[in-house]
Amino acid sequence: MNKDNKWTMINALFITVISVLLAFHLKQHYDQITNENHANKDKINIKNKNVRIYQNLTYNRVFPNSKLDIITPVDMSSNAKLPVIFWMHGGGYIAGDKQYKNPLLAKIAEQGYIVVNVNYALAPQYKYPTPLIQMNQATQFIKENKMNLPIDFNQVIIGGDSAGAQLASQFTAIQTNDRLREAMKFDQSFKPSQIKGAILFGGFYNMQTVRETEFPRIQLFMKSYTGEEDWEKSFKNISQMSTVKQSTKNYPPTFLSVGDSDPFESQNIEFSKKLQELNVPVDTLFYDGTHHLHHQYQFHLNKPESIDNIKKVLLFLSRNTSSSGIQTEEKPQIENPSNELPLNPLN
């Protein structure tokens, strides 16, 4: 065997070993996420006497995880229509569950909003743009049942956290950017005039710079969702995901919240500047570096900053919708009265 062939074989063996180790490493990550998702099935009780929650309504059967929760105020006048908030949870596209967002979302719903909290299929089994397709399906399901809920579809809010904020921001762009919607071959769920705001917690909005944030496991998240190792160059639809590129003057007023120790802080600053350039009203809740607020601090509801975040969200909503955001009095708690809501769930 000559020297060239010997080194060729050694290189091939080295590449094979590295590939096996990488595959094993990724499998460990996927197994960990799977175990986390199984653990997530334990029901989270909402200890909020001012709301009703209708859980795990099936909105479609095409993809797995096609379930949603609806949170409403206890008191809903049949003559008064309420703004609706559609929410997408985070988890890096590969994990997470809607139920963990319900305690915070209930604090918003009790002020006079109907919240629709949407689950979706997870990567790597279900890649881009599956969650966005499912969001379309979820909004359609709610619209088809509009006679059974006092929803004002001229007062729509789109929201999400972490990867869910990226999804929610892109879903909002799909509604307000004709070119993006046509390129993605999506139907329009809402006209720009119907969307009164976007609420985004700790999201990321520029796929060309998100790797630079060094967010933990960002490589795993993006590869799982796009199917590409080098997503910035190899994934043909990467620009569709960058809301900093897809937002237009039709983008709705936006509330951006991020911790000062969150690696995605720079992404939120960049997005806020882009919206300002477009003359889109934007509320920001950013901190000065002394609060040490990590990713998803908003959901640690006992933190003073989390309490402040909810107050700022309600102020934003009161300025952009008909609900006042005034604190409610406690009412007797009603848990999961799903038989009282005459929807047409598929389950």
Residue ranges and their predicted role:
Residues 4-347:
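Alpha/beta-hydrolase superfamily serine-hydrolase fold, recognizing
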